[in-house]
Amino acid sequence: YELILTELESSSSSSSENNNSIIILADVDEKVFEVILRFLYTGDVPTLKKDEDDDEDTMKSILITANRFGVTELKLYVESVLVEYFLIPSRAAKLLLLADSHICALLKEGTMDLYASKSMEVIESNMEEWTKLKKSNNLLVELFVYASSGRHKYSSVVEDGNGTIDDVDGFDVTSLRERLQKYDLDVDGSRDMLIDRWKMYLRANDNKVEEVEFKKER
């Protein structure tokens, strides 16, 4: 809630109007903003209306707005809904562009996994969206490297709960987020950001263990 107020205040900082003035965010859908406020006050999450196209558009709008205002928990919830209910070949290219634009690691991984396993179906089922995707050279290269290198076969299985530095590059997004959340670390960001964050934690923890052992030896 404070983050939303911060943006609202910053958007009016150059205005000389008094504190009772109304701030209009023309590019924010009123119903979507209501969903975000309801989540912040009550914890209620948006529900699907069983109209696939309408539901998809609504969920994407909520995700974009939640990301804009820093409502991370809602953003991650909606991201998981998009992966579970809307990730099909005909929507993969569009969702990949969305995920890349708004740093949605789980959605991005899911769309790239789908491409890796059903590349021709993804391309042929929606040529218009695939054409848009091809305009993003960096993302296209990333997708091809991902699909051709076998990187989509991430594993969450390690001998211990946290894994070692060497294990981390093989974790999928869900595994990374679970471990980060366990220690109250930030779970938002790209997969590379999550990996760096978890490696930093492991290194810091290893240093603490070494320090304790050194003191014992003395």
Q: Language-model segments: what does each one mean?
A:
Residues 3, 7, 39, 62-68, ...:
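Alpha-helical recognition domains of nuclear gene-regulatory proteins
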Residues 11, 32-35, 114, 130, ...:
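A broad, structure-centric signal for solvent-exposed, well-ordered loop/edge residues
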Residues 18-20, 28-31, 57, 69, ...:
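Eukaryote-biased feature marking scaffold/signaling PDZ-domain proteins and nuclear chromatin regulators
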Residues 45, 49-60, 72-161, 209-218:
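Alpha-helical protein-protein interaction/assembly modules
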Residues 154-217:
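Basic helix-extension-helix modules of the SAP/HeH family
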